[in-house]
């Protein structure tokens, strides 16, 4: 069983605890190829490409220029600790025990516009490059063209190594589009998290993103190995709603957001 999540734009660049291991990228050479092309952009190009303010464009231009691979280990940080958006606030990996981080290293994968597919403890450098960015590159018109079937092939390899045929999709549509579903050797289950509002259950983006991280945390804390056990997920008041769910779309609801 593998869980898939999106990365985050917000980053925590404070140093990670030294005792937490750092692992190597699967797609380091591909990331370098992509970054070599991104380095050709000036600050104005970065602003236009990524729809950023001048300040953020300057920051990311500088990140591109400073990026070198292989990394200097002192400057890289584990992906799951670097990202700090809503999903990662729910996951709160920094408070997990070693056994729980080990579970995530086996079962959690992070999709990335620059790095393709990350294990949680892969050391990476700070960056911003969303998967939906329309960046013309040597392989085509955008990042979906750049990554092609590489991400899907690696997922298939890692699922086979686990002897599993189940993928839990906790990623956004923008990122999951980088996975070629028809070529994935897995059953895909997509949890949805809905809150009661104005007389009906609705997906509220902030809460849903946080809940995706909470579900990954729940799986790690409880060392979940059977997919059906995810239906017992109950963090932050969510409960599985069988009447709203289908075989592949599992809906979790709660009456009141915290």
Curated annotation (Swiss-Prot):
It holds the Pfam family H2O2_YaaD. One of its GO terms (cellular component) is cytosol. GO terms for biological process: response to hydroperoxide. InterPro entries: YaaA (IPR005583). HAMAP family: UPF0246 (MF_00652). Belongs to the UPF0246 family. This is UPF0246 protein Tcr_1650. It comes from Hydrogenovibrio crunogenus (strain DSM 25203 / XCL-2).
């Amino acid at each position: 069983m593998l869980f898939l999540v999106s990365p985050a734009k917000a980053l925590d660049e404070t140093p990670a605890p030294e005792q937490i291991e750092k692992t190597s990228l699967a797609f380091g050479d591909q990331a370098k190829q992509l970054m070599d092309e991104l380095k050709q952009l000036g600050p104005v190009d970065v602003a236009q490409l990524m729809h950023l303010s001048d300040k953020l464009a300057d920051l990311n231009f500088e990140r591109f220029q400073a990026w070198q691979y292989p990394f200097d280990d002192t400057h890289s940080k584990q992906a799951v600790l670097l990202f700090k958006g809503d999903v990662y606030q729910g996951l709160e990996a920094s408070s997990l025990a070693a056994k729980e981080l080990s579970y995530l290293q086996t079962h959690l994968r992070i999709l990335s516009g620059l790095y393709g597919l990350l294990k949680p403890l892969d050391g990476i450098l700070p960056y911003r490059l969303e998967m939906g960015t329309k960046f013309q590159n040597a392989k085509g018109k955008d990042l979906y063209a750049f990554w092609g079937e590489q991400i899907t092939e690696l997922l298939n390899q890692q699922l086979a190594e686990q002897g599993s045929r189940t993928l839990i999709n906790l990623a956004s549509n923008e990122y999951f589009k980088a996975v070629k579903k028809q070529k994935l050797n897995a059953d895909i289950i997509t949890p949805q998290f809905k809150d009661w509002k104005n007389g009906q259950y609705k997906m509220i983006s902030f809460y849903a993103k946080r809940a995706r991280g909470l579900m990954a945390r729940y799986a790690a804390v409880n060392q979940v190995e059977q997919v059906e056990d995810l239906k017992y997920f109950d963090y932050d008041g969510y409960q599985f709603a069988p009447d709203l769910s289908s075989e592949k779309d599992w809906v979790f609801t709660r009456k009141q957001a915290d």
